[in-house]
Design a protein with these regions (language model features):
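Positively charged n-region of N-terminal signal peptides that target proteins for export
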Residues: 1-4
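General helical structural elements
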Residues: 6-7, 44
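Bacterial N-terminal signal peptides
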Residues: 8-19
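Carbohydrate-interacting regions of secretory-pathway proteins
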Residues: 20-180
């Protein structure tokens, strides 16, 4: 009985130590890159595949933009959003600031469809740059990433300034993109 207990304790301690060291390795990997570190490896460029119709909405989806109006949105002062809505999309208007949903969210599955301007103007972060903020803290980057070199943690679909996307699957400027 004592021998079994000792073996059990040794195995348990070994498993806990292995889990601790593994977590430290992941933490060290994240900490070895500075924010916007130009030497951080870029994710591979992949073909996004053919554009097609969007998949059906999940039964419990909350649609925040119907293509018709900004009724689910307000500006930073909790006033009606003043972005432009036309042809089924919304577009930021210079000087109107950011917008946010009226409804608050915690855990969610985010689906974003977006397009950058078809006329290429600027480079790096100055080219079709926007983002989706989660909980006023984390930004999921929206950026023209097609043939546009920038730092890894600032690419389209990155958690801006923190973690790069796994791949760069950006389409050409002006084409609709999406990510989940």
């Amino acid at each position: 009985m004592k021998k079994t207990l000792v073996v059990f304790c040794v195995i348990s301690i070994t498993a806990l130590l292995a889990a601790f060291l593994s977590a430290q390795d992941r933490k060290a990997d994240l900490q070895k890159w500075a924010v916007h570190d130009e030497s951080r490896p870029l994710p591979p460029v992949v073909d996004p595949g053919p554009a097609g119709p969007p998949a059906p909405l999940p039964a419990d989806a909350i649609v925040l933009f119907s293509g018709k109006d900004l009724s689910a949105w307000v500006n930073g002062k909790n006033e009606p959003a003043k972005w432009k809505v036309e042809n089924g999309y919304m577009e930021a208007v210079k000087g109107t600031g950011s917008i946010q949903t009226k409804q608050g969210f915690g855990d969610c599955q985010l689906h974003v469809e977006w397009a950058t301007p078809s006329e290429v103007v600027g480079t790096s972060q100055g080219r079709g740059n926007s983002g989706v903020f989660l909980m006023n803290t984390y930004e999921v980057q929206v950026l023209d990433g097609y043939d546009n070199k920038t730092y890894a943690d600032g690419m389209a679909a990155s958690i801006y300034g923190q973690y790069p996307p796994l791949v760069n699957a950006c389409r050409k400027p002006g084409e609709w993109q999406m990510y989940d």
